[in-house]
Amino acid sequence: MSFDVLAMVLAGGMGERLMPLTSVRSKPAVPFGGSYRIIDFTLSNCINSGLRHIYVLTQYKSHSLSRHLRAGWDFLPKRLDQFIDEIPAQMQLGDRWYKGTADAIRQNWTLIEQSPARRVLILSGDHIYKMDYRRMRSFHDGKDAALTVSAIRVPRSEASQFGVLQVDEDNRIIGFQEKPEDPAPIPGTDECLASMGIYVFNREKLGQYLGDGMDDFGRNVIPAMVSAGERVFAFDFTTQNQISENEWIQRDGVRIKRVVERATDSTYWRDVGTLDAYWAASLDLVAAAPSINLYGELWPIYNCPQHFPPAKFVHEEANRTGVAINSIVSDGVIISGAKIRRSILGPGTHVHSYSYIENSVLMGGEQSEEMLLETSIGRGCLIRNAIIDRNVRLSPGTYIGVDRGNDEARGLKVIPIQGTNEHLVVVPKGMEL
């Protein structure tokens, strides 16, 4: 698959619903899972799928993402014509930014023209999932398709957030609704087939449908191709994606390794475009048997190496023991006589004595050429149901996520957690409380 497919990763989104996390960075650059950025999942899928011609199209507040790509993803040998290249917005068609997903491709059409690839794989850089794009390419070729759209089954109650596909018995798309109020279900079920924003195009057909006014794949290009009778198909991610992984089992008293052909995270996909979705997907990772496995051997998720010392837990008095339960603790973290439960601590976080953190995501500190900035949680702090961005400093005795009125009075973003009486609190980057 290496050279017959060109990957174009759309990574310029503003991520307005993720504010304030995206006030200083684009959505694909938001830290996730302790040591990762959101875009690392899409790029890892590309590498694991054998793709070696990859463009990353950036636009909105791209400095953080650009730095991450240079530091962590500039490893393919260009002398062998392999690359992951960042392409900033060029304004090729006038003095304007991208007007939509398809317009981003149109403004970079020269890159596609210069490529020998006959298929173009268009990806979003802001979803959390594992996917073998080779299986989708094989499906596309087997159907002699002009376009294949990867789709996932979602409850009908949630389908209005997505583009919804209607397909025939051969998975050919016969109808498309972009974020409909009354989504059409899969016949006989209470589920809908939702577009994942992942497309395989035949290059020639893609060029035919990128004319003026064709700015967005969901709103313009896909409906136009379906209406024109083009061969447009849906790849059912829920049933057809396959990620193999090793697992250890006991057999006759001996621990042995075997390959599971379709691991459980083959069906995992999350759009983390809202704060509550980001928080929930983050906490998926801390389960004993997580929905998506960051520790797999056969489908690794790569990240940017960071030069922090190992994590450290100190103090052992009965009421002052440094401990983390059902949590992810990154390098450079010091838990100094504090208790952490069901949380993620990013690199460079220091939690001082007698503090308690639960159901929270702390992105940690930040390394620069000049200094190391840490996130510091003072003594006796209580943090529940929170997202705390980088380089935050909390004074001793600070409570977050306990009193909604108090959180709002301090100017923090507060949103309800669906199905509960609790609330999620977001502390922006660099804040001191």
Residue ranges with predicted function:
Residues I112-A117:
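Glycine-rich phosphate-binding loop signature in dinucleotide/nucleotide-binding domains
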Residues K130-E204, Q208-G213, S227-E230:
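Conserved core of the sugar-phosphate nucleotidyltransferase
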Residues M1-L6, E204, D212-L433:
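Left-handed beta-helix
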Residues L123-G125:
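Active-site acidic Asp-centered loop
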Residues H127-K130, R393:
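A short, conserved beta-strand element in the Rossmann-like catalytic core
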Residues D81-I105:
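Active-site-proximal specificity loops/subdomain of glycosyltransferases
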Residues M1-D74, L80-Q82, Q92-D95, L111, ...:
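N-terminal glycine-rich phosphate-binding loop and ensuing alpha1 helix
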Residues V120:
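Short aromatic/hydrophobic "clamp" motif used to bind/position activated sugar donors
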